[in-house]
Amino acid sequence: MKNRLMWAAKFFAALIVSAFTVSCAPDEDVYKDAIKGIIIESQVPLIQLESNFNGERLSYQIENPNFYDSVKIASGEATPKPAVFQAASLSKVVFSYIVMKMYDRGEIDLDAPLCNYTDIDRFEDKESASKLTARMVLNHRTGLPNWSKSPSSQEWPVSTITFKYPVDSCYGYSGEGFAFLQRAVEKIRGKKIDDVAKEEVFKPLGMEYTSYEWQPMYDTLAVDGYNKDGENRGKGRHPRANVGYTLRTCAADYAKFLQALLDGTGLSPKAKEVFFTPCGEKAIRYAENHRECDNSIAWAMGIGTEENPEFGKVLWHWGDNGSFKALFILIPSANGYLTYFTNSNHGHDIINDITALVIKNREPFAINDWINKD
């Protein structure tokens, strides 16, 4: 009951902000102050946010004065403009879009064994590995663990991959599966994945600050991340491009990508439908603990879905690299999106507050519990 009362208070506060904004044509300081209050309360140092609903577009980069100098905040010198963040698993959705474009052109068969395209040397169980397909990877039904070892470690590229579940038996989130599919795409295209991404996504959409690899501009634009205790953990450079987690971007760039997803840019209607259609099984995040929120969540081709009583199908993904956390929500029925990036371990604590403010949903999204509750 207490949580519902808190949610109701936030929802009505969002309505007040909305009414004030409409009547004042619009006063963006109302949103800015509300977002600033949210990140101060949740101990998030920095947030970038982009949204576009019903023609009302929001674009913010807001610093927390408890982490950055107030004088520099006022002068605009506290953080680089635009700040570049680790996108974490939002990396996967950009890659999924690339795969779906290749599928649309007949360059990859979603149901063909990936061993037709690349080797399976790292897999302990070769028979199971030979059954893996792109569709299984994108639906997170490979049976693989998230990672065999830390993917930024020196040992990871040659580490042995052991199956966690039987192939195609259940939902099981796996970065290792995406890395396997990355190798297949690189073999098909004869190029490194960042070069493929530049051709397919970054250049066509004007995402000039986005890359799977470290770029010289990141020396000044990339921001430091902060752990749960508010300690600076640095920028966190990764040793190699990995579609599971190494994308760096800014919210404005990623918003261009989200608009392209909504519009189906570069995809036939059929491919867009396949992209956004869930596999039919619920995405039960913890096999030993079936939660109520799991009943609303499934996985399409590299993108999460929520069946929402207010908005219908909602498309989403979260990013979690520890000291960098991010989120996007696409609502096709409203032709709108919200995305935000934070440099904080607390970056997902604000999901309900931010969605109530920006989307003005009457009830919390199941997404919040799916991400935050064990």
Residue ranges of model-derived segments:
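Bacterial Sec-dependent N-terminal signal peptides
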Residues: 1-31
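Catalytic loop of the DD-peptidase/beta-lactamase superfamily, centered on the K-T-G motif
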Residues: 24-64, 198-199, 203, 235-374
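Stable alpha-helical elements in mature extracytoplasmic
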Residues: 31-35, 91, 110-114, 130-134, ...
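Short, conserved catalytic-motif segment at the N-terminal edge
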Residues: 32-85, 107, 154-161
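Short active-site loop at a secondary-structure junction
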Residues: 45, 71-136, 163-176, 242-245, ...
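Catalytic-site signature segments of enzymes, centered on catalytic residues
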Residues: 77-84, 144-221, 239-255, 259
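Active-site helix/loop module of the DD-peptidase/beta-lactamase fold
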Residues: 86-90, 102-144, 187-230, 266
